[in-house]
Amino acid sequence: MGLPSLLVEGVIGCTLVGGLVAVGSAALAVRATIGVVEFNRECVRGARRIVSSGGRCLIVQSPYGNPNQGLIRGEDEEIDNVEESTPEELTQLIEVKAEVDGKEVVVSKKRVVNRHLRQRFVRSIAIEAKNHFGGDISPSKANYLSVSKFLTGKCKERHVVPAHTRDCVSAAMVLVFTPDVHEIRMMAGLASDAAYARKIAMASILNRKGWCWRLMVNPLDRARWWEMWCVVNGFDSNKPVTFPKXGGLFYLNGVETKIRRGGHPSVIEVDGQCPPRERKLYVQNAITTGYEYRVHNHSYANLRRGLLERVFYVERNKELVSCPQPEPGSFKEMGYLRRRFHRVCGNHTRISANDLVDCYQGRKRTIYENAAASLLDRAIERKDGDLKTFIKAEKFNVNLKSDPAPRVIQPRSPRYNVELGRYLKKYEHHAYKALDKIWGGPTVMKGYTTEEVAQHIWSAWNQFQTPVAIGFDMSRFDQHVSVAALEFEHSCYLACFEGDAHLANLLKMQLVNHGVGFASNGMLRYTKEGCRMIGDMNTALGNCLLACLITKHLMKIRSRLINNGDDCVLICERTDIDYVVSNLTTGWSRFGFNCIAEEPVYEMEKIRFCQMAPVFDGAGWLMVRDPLVSMSKDSHSLVHWNNETNAKQWLKSVGMCGLRIAGGVPIVQEFYQKYVETAGNVKENKNITEKSSSGFFMMADRAKRGYSAVSEMCRFSFYQAFGITPDQQIALEGEIRSLTIDTNVGPQCEAADSLWILNRKYQ
């Protein structure tokens, strides 16, 4: 192709491209003109719609609709003309029927919300939530979860179907988290001129000028000169009466039981007919929940009642009767469990006396060192197994029971404990692990922290599709341990020690007990067959062994047991509830025990184990004591406060232990932190921990928690466990932080009422 041809084609191509560009530009110009016309037309139409609708068309409509505006308007319209209707009247019952054996029977019942009465039903459950949570609620995550759970529970109580429950709960949440007419009227009243005038009048009275100023302002007033005369003669000036909050440190004397009844031929009584030596219970009542505690004196009257009612007799229909005995052959039925326990636990040998002594610290170590030394000079004797009985220095709640039977402690001699401890002290932990394996997971909650216990409960809970927990314990477990029960327990030990004759002789001393109890004003001498003697080396081990194996024998279903002596929680499927409840009480009675089963619970936080409940802190589970009980009980001390320094040392010890156990937990964290702040820089007294070697101090031994921010999930879980709403938690924490504990010991006074809301009767 030549050069001329290329030039011709180039000219033609340029002409065509230019033409196309011109056509495109013309088309864009035409479309722009049309767009301007359309825009102007829409503007005119929009202006016409705005004018004709009065501006209502400017409100953006949600694609999902906005029915809650009508709900709120309906509440405002009905607020002054409320017709009382129960939620059941606002729902419709639907019965699902089926034919069984030729007959039509009702298989299930459910309720649906009547669509014509939906708004009234929603307002009804919203009002219940308002009343429960205390009006206007802060919009926190914890409150959102708590209110949602509460509303869902109200729908479940009426058996509302899930779809309608979701619809009604979402609508009711709007009403709960917005102020209603009552709250608006209340705030309007508080902000009114009349209310302001009252506040000014009160402030003017409380802030009165001094008597000298009043005399200068009113020199002709006779009352002012009379007031001056009174002041000159040593009287106080005329001031408004104020009512300061009570609260401080004081002590209470020990108490005597007022009940004397019964007697037993095996008990020799010697009444000294003189006043008893009184114990003291020290109290701080600046921060408390209202429960009052006392301590029993170690006196003849208390010792007598404690022995008769906690060792020899049980109460039935307000009469003292002998303890029930197990059915003949009942413990022989459990021979297969003893053999299984032996296979899992294995054989063991006793440890040396020095190894046993090394297991203890402080004063108890010294006692056992001396006992071990005496055994080198003189072998164990029968009298070493005799009991030395005394009244336990224990705080008891007078609000729950004003005059309970005192608890007795019945230890044997340290020489006997050393000999038996050489067999059972180290063996005890192997026995617990064997019980764990028999039950298929951690079962005996000895030696665990509160977090570990809660985690074990959570793991057991998650092993079931529809879990339910049934708590149960045996009324006065130790008292109901019969000779047959002791013989079965001892046979488990002897199997693991290959029938050791010396161990058999030591255990035989527990079958027939000889004891004496000395008080400051009398004494008692007695003989008792069987019965667990609190103070024996094998008290905890024996109780756990019996509780775990008897329950395993009774429960022929898939289940998990959480145990700590006589305190038990059984977790299983909901379909097995009837089987468990019917077999627990009747089954345990065959072994001579009085089993008390609690109501089944279906939520983790509702479980009660050792007077604690599981609470989720946002990262994991931990066991938390009921604040209503713990904050009052930890306000009472069995350690003497001889001076202000001793009181501060006790406050610091309790506060630090409490923070290690309950750091990051609502309310109680601030309670223990206040103890630490009140103690200041006082030096710790390690003797206090030894004197107060209770479960509280032992729980804190391995705990590692501390003061930290409370998570929203923890507030919600705490509400689930104890019923204290998140807003109430925050309010109480602020109140605790504002209070001051006076560490000067003074006369007894009434407790401060700042934490009244924790009392269950107000909830």
UniProtKB/Swiss-Prot annotation:
Keywords tagged on the record: Nucleotide-binding, Nucleotidyltransferase, RNA suppression of termination, RNA-directed RNA polymerase, Transferase, Viral RNA replication
InterPro entries the record matches: DNA/RNA_pol_sf, Rev_trsase/Diguanyl_cyclase, RNA-dir_pol_PSvirus, RNA_pol_HCV
Domain RdRp catalytic: 467-580
E.C. numbers: 2.7.7.48
Protein's GO biological process: viral RNA genome replication
Enzyme class of the recorded protein, top EC level: transferase
GO molecular function: nucleotide binding; RNA binding; RNA-directed RNA polymerase activity
Record field: catalytic activity: RNA(n) + a ribonucleoside 5'-triphosphate = RNA(n+1) + diphosphate
Keyword Hydrolase: no
Misc. remarks from the entry: Readthrough of the terminator UAG occurs at position 246.
Function: RNA-dependent RNA polymerase that plays an essential role in the virus replication.
Protein name, entry field: Probable RNA-directed RNA polymerase
Organism: Carnation mottle virus (isolate China/Shanghai)
Lineage, opening ranks: Viruses, Riboviria, Orthornavirae, Kitrinoviricota, Tolucaviricetes
